[in-house]
Amino acid sequence: VSLPLIDAHVALAGYADLWVALVLGLALLAWARWLLFREPRQWLLAVLLVACLPAIKLEGAIWLLAFVAVALLERLPRRWRWVLPGGVVLLLAVILGADLLGVPLPSVGKVHIGWGRIDIAGVASYTLKWHAVGGPMLASLYELPNWHLLWYLLPALIVWRWRDVCRSEAARLLGLFVLLQLAALFVLFFLTSASAWAEDFTSVNRLILQVVPGVLVFVAVLLRDPASANEKPVRETDLPGLRKPATRG
């Protein structure tokens, strides 16, 4: 709560970024409890909260898709977790090559993605090309007084708790979600005309603000006492509606 940029947004009226961050943070906290303790009501709460994101702001639809992708990966049997995603990536590459990919996003419309461009119906069209905005991005994260020591401490914490990252499925999945968020921001700022937002330091930190909840939940999972790290294994009957009826023996 003491992060300077969050304090600034609390005092500003009309910006939805803080609300996106709040709802996403609550969803990820609920999902983390599902991953750690297999509480079905927390899984339902996470799904309901994430489903609200597109109604708040355009970026919410992107985070919804990222969450769905990671949540589906978590539900796959372990032997399929890399085979199936690899097949999906290959299929997407073929579709992109044929310039056929159109994705409907809630409250946004159809998004057409092809090599070299992204067209969002009724919103904008982006031509994909490299923009060298590494300097402003690093300044936003490390030099300007926006995030205290958050982005300095995160890499150090990952190195310190690397064994926990390898052992904890919850940490790995939350980390994957954060990586998908960072990848989306990389494409936006380094490959589209939105790079101007990074160069003049306007919207870049407002979008980074939406990544912070995932980072903080990931950090909280890593900092758990190893002695209390009793993650429950997933079972097919854990999710609501999938419980098998009791049988008399």
Regions found by a protein language model. Give the residues of each.
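Membrane-interface alpha helices of multi-pass inner-membrane proteins
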Residues: 1, 9, 31, 42-58, ...
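Transmembrane alpha-helix segments characteristic
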Residues: 1-2, 48-50, 167-194
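Multi-pass, polyprenyl lipid-linked donor-dependent membrane glycosyltransferases
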Residues: 6-26, 56
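Specific aromatic-rich, kink-prone transmembrane helix
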Residues: 19-36, 49, 214
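Membrane-interface helix-loop-helix junctions at transmembrane boundaries of multi-pass membrane enzymes
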Residues: 38-41, 77-83, 159-179
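Perimembrane helix-loop-helix junctions
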Residues: 63-89, 165
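Hydrophobic, aromatic-rich transmembrane alpha-helices
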Residues: 72, 133-175
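Extracytoplasmic catalytic-loop and juxtamembrane helix elements of membrane-embedded
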Residues: 99-132, 193-202
